[in-house]
C-alpha cells in the first residue's frame, strides 16, 4: 500500500518509497516548451537513439560549478506517471494552439510502460565541484521507438538543475571567501572555526522566492555548500526527502 502523495520507484535495483512535497496530480506533459510538441516530426527517418547532455557554458562568470538538483527532479517530476487523462488534456491544449502532438506515442507510454518515461539519466554525483564545460548529466532513450522523449524533458530538467546549481555555486564561492577570511584574520581553528563558518551566511531567501518550490530548491542549494544557517524551513524538509539528510 502506498500512501497518497507518496511514490514507489526502483533505483539501482532497490525499491524505495518516498513522499513528494508538491502536487502529484499536475500534468507533467505541459512541463515543456511549446516547440517540443512538434519536435518528434523533425528527426531524420530511421532515428532510433538520441543522447543529450547538459553542461555549463565555458566563459561563464564562475570558474567552478557546484552541481546539484537532479535528485529533486527525478523524485518529484520524472516519477510522475503519464496517464490517459494527461495525454487527452495535452492534446486539447495542442489543438487550441494549432500545434502537432504525438498522441499515439504518449499513449504507448501509458499502455506499454505503465506511464513511465523510457529514458535513462546518468550524471555526476551531486555535490561535485567541476569546471565549466564539464558534462553534468546525460539523457538517453531506452527503447528505439521513443528517441523523441530524450529532448522532450529538456525544459523541465534544465529548470530543476540550473536554479539549485546556481544558488549552490554562488553560496560555495561565499563559503570559501568566509573560510579564507577567518583563517587570515582570526585565531579560530578546528571545531571553533568550523562552527563559526557554518553560520556566517544565513538563508532568509524563502520570503523573496518566486514560489514554494523555488524556496525549497534554492534553500537546498545553499545547504549543499557546507553552510548550516537557514530559516528556509522547507529546504530542510527537502534535504531529508530527496537526499536522506537531516
Q: Model regions: which residues?
A:
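Universal eukaryotic N-terminal targeting presequences
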Residues: 1-12
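Residue-identity detector for glutamine
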Residues: 3, 39-42, 71
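Poly-acidic low-complexity segments
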Residues: 8-10, 33, 69, 102
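Buried, small/hydrophobic-residue-enriched core segments of structured protein domains
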Residues: 14-61, 109-118, 122, 127-246
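Low-complexity, highly charged intrinsically disordered N-terminal segments
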Residues: 46, 50-102
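Short, positively charged
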Residues: 101-109
